[in-house]
């Protein structure tokens, strides 16, 4: 199991010697006894969050971590049904959410997908395990800290049913409420609202309209605009394609791909076509355990995995395979992610062939 280490390049020079000594202690800890291990790690690292328990002054002067650029590790995350440790929902899950990549949590119903993202987003505390991003660690049963609150403010969560997170009677209020609470704008800042509505493809929508009157696709976009208006750096989406038509799904995919350079994105989905078009990495859960962590291309090209777990390949992979079996090879086959890409490749292929007279 990975042991956290304090990153010296993120803290002031005068604390380097103290941090080096702490890293030596961390390296010597025995990780076999999990509960005592977490408590000891927490005790060693915690002084580096604050100067003392009374003054909430960050040691690192806002350089504790770069949430959109530092990898986020989760280590031995386990969640039980209750405090008596009856039944595990997720079991010893470890992995990494990389920056500038879209990661999908994939698996059958009841595999623990939603439970895992609630741990990654700090919405629930794990029974065991910890999350580590640069010099920030979040442990099972850890008390709320100011730095944890600051970390949470950078995380946006979009529910499967977007309307479940609507609280206001107008689109303008819905977009601005979270941002106003964080003091990022004032209550009737139309320009601020339109900036994020435009970003999400809602540039022509009336601001006085009730969010409930929107289509399912528009509701998803409004929920996304409301979250982005809070300037989050870590975006979590739970089954974002449910209820959307193909055009809305395609637009959502393009939007998320464009955002990934500035926002860490994690998606829970069982829509294999959307996953193949949108994501870079896949974490496959089965009965609460992670069984695969790999690139999306590698996952869907492994026919034995797909057959073993009863997964139907994306339609575009089936179409490309059909062309290959007919003797048609594509120059940029690895880049074919959707129907538009396939049509473009076919046009290029046949435009290069000389006409037969």
Curated annotation (Swiss-Prot):
CDD domains per the UniProt record, alphabetical = ABC_cobalt_CbiO_domain1
PROSITE patterns reported for this sequence: ABC_TRANSPORTER_2
Q: Which UniProt keywords apply?
A: ATP-binding, Nucleotide-binding, Transport
Give all residue intervals belonging to the ABC transporter domain: 72-312
Q: Which SMART domains match?
A: AAA
Instruction: Provide the species name.
Output: Mycoplasma genitalium (strain ATCC 33530 / DSM 19775 / NCTC 10195 / G37) (Mycoplasmoides genitalium)
Which residues take part in binding ATP? 107-114
Pfam families linked to this entry: ABC_tran
**Similarity annotation:** Belongs to the ABC transporter superfamily.
Transmembrane segments in this chain: where?
none
An example molecular function term from Gene Ontology annotations: ATP hydrolysis activity
This one is known as Putative ABC transporter ATP-binding protein MG303
| GO annotations of cellular component type | ATP-binding cassette (ABC) transporter complex
UniProt KW ATP-binding keyword:
yes
**Residue ranges the record marks as coiled coil:** none
Tell me the PANTHER family matching this sequence.
ENERGY-COUPLING FACTOR TRANSPORTER ATP-BINDING PROTEIN ECFA1 (PTHR43553:SF24), HEAVY METAL TRANSPORTER (PTHR43553)
């Amino acid at each position: 199991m990975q042991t956290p280490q304090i990153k010296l390049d993120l803290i002031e020079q005068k604390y380097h010697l103290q941090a080096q000594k702490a890293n030596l202690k961390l390296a010597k800890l025995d990780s076999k006894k999990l509960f005592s291990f977490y408590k000891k790690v927490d005790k060693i690292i915690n002084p580096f969050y604050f100067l003392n328990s009374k003054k909430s002054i960050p040691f690192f002067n806002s350089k504790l971590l770069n949430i959109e650029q530092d990898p986020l590790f989760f280590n031995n995350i386990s969640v039980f049904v209750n405090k008596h440790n009856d039944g595990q929902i997720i079991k010893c899950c470890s992995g990494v959410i990389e920056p500038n990549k879209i990661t999908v949590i994939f698996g059958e119903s009841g595999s623990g997908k939603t439970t895992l993202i609630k741990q990654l987003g700090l919405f629930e505390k794990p029974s065991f395990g910890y999350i580590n991003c640069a010099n920030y660690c979040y442990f099972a049963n850890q008390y709320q800290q100011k730095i944890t609150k600051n970390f949470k403010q950078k995380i946006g969560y979009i529910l499967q049913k977007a309307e479940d997170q609507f609280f206001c009677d107008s689109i303008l209020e819905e977009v601005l409420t979270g941002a106003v609470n964080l003091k990022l704008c004032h209550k009737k800042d139309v320009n601020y609202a339109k900036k994020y509505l435009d970003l999400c493809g809602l540039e022509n929508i009336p601001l006085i309209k009730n969010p409930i009157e929107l289509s399912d696709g528009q509701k998803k976009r409004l929920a996304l605009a409301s979250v982005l208006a809070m300037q989050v750096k870590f975006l979590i989406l739970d089954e974002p394609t449910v209820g959307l038509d193909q055009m809305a799904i395609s637009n959502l995919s393009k939007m998320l791909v464009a955002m990934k350079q500035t926002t860490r994105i994690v998606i829970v989905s069982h829509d294999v076509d959307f996953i193949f078009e949108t994501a870079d990495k896949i974490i496959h859960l089965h009965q609460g355990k992670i069984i695969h962590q790999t690139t999306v291309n590698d996952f869907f090209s492994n026919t034995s995995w797909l057959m073993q777990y009863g997964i139907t390949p994306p339609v575009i992979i089936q179409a490309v395979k059909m062309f290959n079996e007919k003797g048609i090879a594509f120059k940029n086959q690895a880049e074919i992610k959707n129907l538009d890409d396939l049509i473009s490749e076919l046009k290029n292929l046949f435009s290069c062939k000389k006409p037969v007279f």
